[in-house]
Amino acid sequence: MLLANNSTYPVGLDISDLSIKLVQLNKIRGKIKVQALGKLTLPPGIITNGAINDRAELIKAIKKIIAAPGYGKVSSEEAAVCLPESKTFIKRIEVAKSPNSLADVIGAEIEKHVPMSKSEIYYDWQVTAELADKYQVLIGAAPKEIVDQYAQLLDDAKLSVAAMEIEPTAICRGLLKEEAPEAKPAAAPLKPEGTAPLNYGIIDIGANHTCLIFYSDNTIVFSVSMPISGEEITAKISRTLDLTPEQAEKAKIICGLDETKANGVIKKILEETIKNLISKIKEALDFYENYYGGKLNKILLCGGGGNITELGKIIAQEFSIKVETADALTNLDETGEKFNPIFMEKHSFDAKLLKNDSSREGNNLSIQQNSGSTFTTAIGLALRGIFIDEL
């Protein structure tokens, strides 16, 4: 028997190479609450760079987390799923007004903005602002092969598709108050030229890629993938210090870029990688400022790599921009304490493995880490149905 307050909103499923994260939300007396939340680690090789290698095992994993999410109980057979960010494209463009329909103009110009032929992609668009002589339009596109693969996956898992989204869309919805319906302007009103936007950069450092999203004036401007990942950082530590991947992961989390931890051994190993990340951010930031104008007001860090100790401080110093760790519960009426059994992770590491017996902390290093920001995409997907209802 279903409880009276069981949610009918779709489940948000964030399926990545290494895990599945699930969130279902409900609206109770005007408050957005978590109905179900959970995480399931995937064995290596089931998914590689977003491509599904072992469909049968992935279907089993989806069914498992649906049946037992960890917190709460799933009460919907609909799901909103995120398409692999590295396989998709999203960008704000400007389209001059003309006698032709906007749909026809965008269809004719889509290949100028997406590095694939029109016949190979599904694409969608929405007007984000109307100016005197042009429209600002957000376009998104994904390869048909990937979309069809994920649609079939959900069908095989006995779930109906509520939505398939490009990851930056879900991330922004999960993190920014500007994405809530009450913050949105009425359907693309005429906007005076020169209106000052509120500009964000969002850096999502995931297990197998990093994504930098630029967000201005209540809409995504563009996103860029970077060839840096949490796994790459862990592997570099493992190779350099001859540690197991598990030991290297703990060293990364506990020591990070803090030069006072283990005498800065891990920071030294990561310096070249972080320089590369800073360089890529600078390239994207220069493009944003030169092509779109404006300056970033704030950078938000999310994803597992966003918790690397001292990373935010280094980025803030490099670009003189305020940097914060993202709060994935921003648009929910929840506090994080009730999810601590899932969010909070304790990591311990023996500094002797670093041949660093002189560490001031002693040999045993440990840290309590909140992994809540890794649920950003799943929360953003789950918010979609609620926000649509509120429009």
Region locations from a protein language model:
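Hydrophobic/aromatic-enriched cytosolic interaction surfaces used to assemble or bind macromolecules
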Residues: M1-L391
